[in-house]
Amino acid sequence: MATWRRDGRLTGSQRLLCAGLAGAFSLSLTAPLELATVLAQVGKVQSHSLGLWATGRRVWLSEGPRALWKGNGVACLRLFPCSMVQLAAYRKFVVLFMDDLGRISQWSSIVTGSLAGMVSTIVTYPTDLIKTRLMVQNVLEPSYRGLIHAFSTIYQQEGFLALYRGVSLTVLGAVPFSAGSLLVYMNLEKVWNGPRDRFSHLQNFANVCVAAAVSQTLSFPFDTVKRKMQAQSPYLPHYGGVDVHFSGAADCFRQIVKTQGVLGLWNGLTANLLKVVPYFGVMFSMFEFCKRIFLYQNGYTLSPLTYKLTPGVDQSLKPQELRELKKFFKRRKLHSKTPPW
């Protein structure tokens, strides 16, 4: 039976690989929607006023179909270091919130996850900035030829701190994001009329999608300002295509509200929300597919296509323990076949 909870039958590296591959597939599938979101946030060629279809069509006709996946390679590459840092940070933070019995509350779990995510985002922030720069540039007349070239060019032209432009918005945006997650998860039992540990897989999937949608909606203004700060550069054509001129984060908020109204802070939200269901749907499906392969490889199941358990195998054993047990019985079997003379 599939489960979204942590499975002790997988090694740490196997779980990381499952998460990385699932994330890469999800990002690749929803990359055109992510592009539409970022273009609307930055204000590139007034993409927020065109609509999703018109934005995609304009990019396709002017730059080619490959342009719909601009920046996706960098987004996929940063998954593994980001996941590793987030996991390490989570293990450190979770100890601080545990009670004497080693338990952690729902609120503490959300805060711990948010803090770990914030740390991983800050550590890998230069790759996020470069991803934005690659997405807003024209692939036919690129200012950056890839991750390494972009990193080197930005560092030489604008200095090291330019790679962290807008990072403060990540910290500020974590507050409404965590509040949105808490708001959803605190009301799950009322909505489903049952305890969390009895939720079905479909209910868990719906919970994740709703929590993501609410959290991202509340924190979206901070993400919009961050994208504008990331894209803006005097060394790029038209200052990176940003639709407002500003001198900092606070001024960027003011200029957006002044020129576009308060709703201008949510430009691109529709595309962002449309990618929630396919993103998590593909992520969960791909994670379970990879998980089945590793469970079969580790000897817990009879086939990589199903969750049918291997008879006689203790499913509570960890992979290393199961391997040692198999070696023990193999040696014992060989010893029993050896003649006494």
UniProtKB/Swiss-Prot annotation:
InterPro entries for this protein: Mit_carrier, Mitochondrial_sb/sol_carrier, Mt_carrier_dom_sf
Keywords for this protein: Membrane, Mitochondrion, Mitochondrion inner membrane, Repeat, Transmembrane, Transmembrane helix, Transport
A cellular-component GO term for this protein: mitochondrion
Primary localisation category: mitochondrion
Transmembrane portions of the chain: 16-36, 68-88, 110-130, 166-186, 205-225, 262-282
GO biological process: transmembrane transport
Mitochondrion in keyword set: yes
Solcar repeats: 11-101, 105-185, 200-298
Membrane topology, as annotated: Multi-pass membrane protein
Gene3D superfamilies reported for this sequence: Mitochondrial carrier domain
Location of the protein in the cell: Mitochondrion inner membrane
Family note: Belongs to the mitochondrial carrier (TC 2.A.29) family.
Protein name in the entry: Solute carrier family 25 member 43
Organism name: Mus musculus
